[in-house]
């Protein structure tokens, strides 16, 4: 449920998430904020996005980000990742990011969570409850979400063609 509903005509499509294409335009840099396993998914996401867009992408530990003066502006996109959507450090980092940019996107599993409510847009991963200590299910769907985001961003910013995007998704 993470990937299939977000692919139309072999292209990434976030219309079911109510995310307009304009959200992906004019992005100067991206900061990914998370804790724990979600941060490791963010590191993979950084590589995917940076390799496609050739713009600065940083990964920040939420517990540190919230105490720093963030280097973000209105053209910055901040992607916040949390399995539960309630991680307090990540939520506080999101609140700080919202003071600087309207381009905040959360990747969360739990519908209606605090992080989802306070983000400009949200991608629900639909992973279901995580039973094990090792968060493999959540990690996998977070990485899949980054894969689609990297493709959508690159296509919207004309870094790859529609045909390249289809190859990327296919």
Question: What annotation goes with each model-predicted range?
Answer:
Residues 4, 16-17, 87, 91:
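Short, well-ordered alpha-helical scaffold segments within catalytic/effector domains
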Residues 6, 19-22, 164-170:
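Exposed alpha-helical structural elements
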